[in-house]
A protein has these predicted regions:
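Generic detector of well-ordered alpha-helical packing
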Residues: 19-23, 55, 113
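Conserved PLP phosphate-binding loop immediately N-terminal to the Schiff-base lysine helix
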Residues: 1-5, 12-36, 40-43, 49
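PLP-dependent aminotransferase class I/II
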Residues: 2-4, 11, 27, 63-207
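Active-site PLP attachment segment
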Residues: 35-80, 112
Length: 207
């Protein structure tokens, strides 16, 4: 589907931005998820594949977008962008440019502590991703023998990174989700919706 989405966006001059917060390490057709579009987002919250306690990252190969995001990340100033950026052409005097603000920016730079934790996590990332795949095979082996749940399988030429293990209730468990959630909680098994659903139905859209 990523290839189809990319083709649709290219044909209609649309910008493809991938929410990849739960798919770190996943790939399709030997191309990492989050690299198919103009930009891709990742979350490094503590429950995700790679943890830095909080925060995340955005990846892009668009230099203009990169400069805009670097500026927005740090107060809207220009000290972190290139000398000849389309966003702003620097004067060449670092003293003058150090506090030149061109965007209504934020202060969302990662802390050094988060960076240190992230570097340690990154060194173990491949092993952790491999273990998630091993775990998924155990779960798939069990669910292959039941008729009350349909599991999510990788599509052809894809690698699944298993943020969690998702399934859809069917047959005698159809429409009994609350009962299943209650039972899982009794055994201290954490569960959540597969995704957030239609975001356009959230109250924030009305504001």
């Amino acid at each position: 589907e990523l290839a189809d989405l990319k083709r649709i966006c290219d044909n209609r001059a649309l910008v493809l931005i991938e929410d990849n917060c739960e798919s770190f390490g996943a790939s399709h057709q030997n191309k990492y998820c989050a690299t198919w579009g103009t930009a891709g987002t990742f979350s490094f919250f503590f429950s995700h594949h790679l943890q830095t306690m909080e925060g995340g990252m955005i990846v892009t190969d668009d230099q203009d977008l990169y400069d805009y995001m670097r500026s927005l990340r740090a107060h809207g100033w220009v000290r972190d962008i290139g000398d000849n950026s389309s966003l702003y052409t620097k004067s060449g005097d670092p003293f003058e440019d150090s506090f030149r603000f061109v965007l209504p920016g934020y202060c969302v730079r990662p802390l050094e502590m988060s960076g240190a934790v992230g570097q340690v996590q990154l060194s173990k990332a491949n092993d952790m991703l491999d273990q998630r795949i091993v775990n998924s095979k155990i779960y798939h082996h069990f669910f292959d023998n039941v008729d009350y749940a349909r599991t999510q399988l990788p599509t052809q030429n894809s690698v699944h990174s298993y943020f969690g293990f998702s399934f859809v209730l069917e047959n005698n468990l159809y429409n009994r989700r609350k009962e299943v959630i209650h039972l899982l909680k009794e055994y201290d098994i954490e569960c959540r919706p597969i995704v957030a659903g239609n975001f356009m139905r959230n109250p924030v859209i009305d504001r």
